């Protein structure tokens, strides 16, 4: 899967650095990151993204039930309020970004759980997942792969 990045070495290298920053340098708690990532993956219908798991997940209380219920982020009792808010942000980021921008009630709720710094990390992470997931899906790259980070 990584081989396709070598076709465009400058952009591929930049995407690799951005990916590294999202997965290894952001400040999101792992469960928050994973619910947001998976919500974007659902919106993108990206099989490789949906099949990706973090090897540290079990230590953070993430099991397959966590992933199985991402589409039920509003109601599944296994998610915290912070995780629900991250899932809502990610879902709306991927499906209706202008309404998200204008939803003052959402932003008030969001600031109950996240600082501006964490929101910035969440938004930039969603940007990576949305863009990369769509590239993978549109070009049919790795759609049968399962990855462990």
Residue ranges and their predicted role:
Residues 19, 35-40, 70, 86-94, ...:
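Short alpha-helical scaffolding segments that buttress acidic/His motifs in well-ordered protein cores
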Residues 29-37, 66, 84, 118-121:
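Alpha-helical scaffolds flanking conserved acidic
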Residues 12, 50-69:
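Iron-sulfur (Fe-S) cluster-binding segments and ferredoxin-like electron-carrier domains
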Residues 1-3, 104-119, 125-149:
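Secretory/periplasmic and organellar redox-cofactor proteins
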Residues 33-56:
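Short, thiol/selenol-centered motifs that function as redox-active sites or metal-ligating centers
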Residues 71-79:
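Acidic/His metal-coordination segments adjacent to aromatic residues that form catalytic metal sites
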């Amino acid at each position: 899967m990584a081989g396709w990045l070598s076709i465009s070495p400058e952009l591929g290298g930049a995407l690799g650095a951005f990916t590294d920053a999202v997965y290894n340098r952001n400040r999101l708690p792992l469960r928050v990151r994973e619910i947001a990532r998976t919500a974007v993956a659902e919106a993108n219908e990206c099989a490789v993204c949906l099949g990706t798991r973090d090897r540290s997940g079990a230590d953070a209380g993430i099991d397959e039930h966590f992933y199985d219920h991402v589409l039920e982020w509003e109601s599944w009792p296994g998610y915290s309020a912070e995780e629900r808010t991250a899932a809502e942000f990610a879902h709306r980021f991927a499906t209706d970004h202008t309404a998200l921008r204008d939803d003052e009630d959402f932003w008030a709720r969001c600031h109950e759980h996240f600082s501006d710094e964490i929101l910035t990390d969440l938004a930039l992470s969603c940007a990576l997942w949305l863009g990369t997931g769509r590239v993978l899906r549109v070009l049919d790259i790795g759609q049968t792969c399962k990855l462990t980070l």
